[in-house]
Curated annotation (Swiss-Prot):
The record marks 49-50 as: Reactive bond. This is Serine protease inhibitor 3. In vitro, active against alpha-chymotrypsin. Keywords: Disulfide bond, Protease inhibitor, Repeat, Secreted, Serine protease inhibitor, Signal. Belongs to the protease inhibitor I19 family. Disulfide bonds join 24-39, 34-52, 37-47. Its main location: secreted. It comes from Schistocerca gregaria (Desert locust).
Length: 63
């Protein structure tokens, strides 16, 4: 039982660290060449869903 709890805690901590690494600064905006993205008050990207024709270049990368 103790090992199961330890594994659960490790997974929980890993998930929280990953979530924080992907968070953005609330109010910040980015343009990917077609759509605008705004960072919500909760730290998540919200983007317009305008159709974007295929292009040779990449787009905005959230990493």
């Amino acid at each position: 039982m103790a090992k199961l709890l330890a594994v659960f805690l490790v997974l929980l901590i890993a998930a929280l660290v990953c979530e924080q690494a992907l968070a953005c600064t609330p109010g910040s905006r980015k343009y990917d060449g077609c759509n605008w993205c705004t960072c919500s008050s909760g730290g998540a990207w919200i983007c317009t869903l305008k159709y974007c024709p295929p292009s040779s270049g990449g787009g905005l990368t959230f990493a």
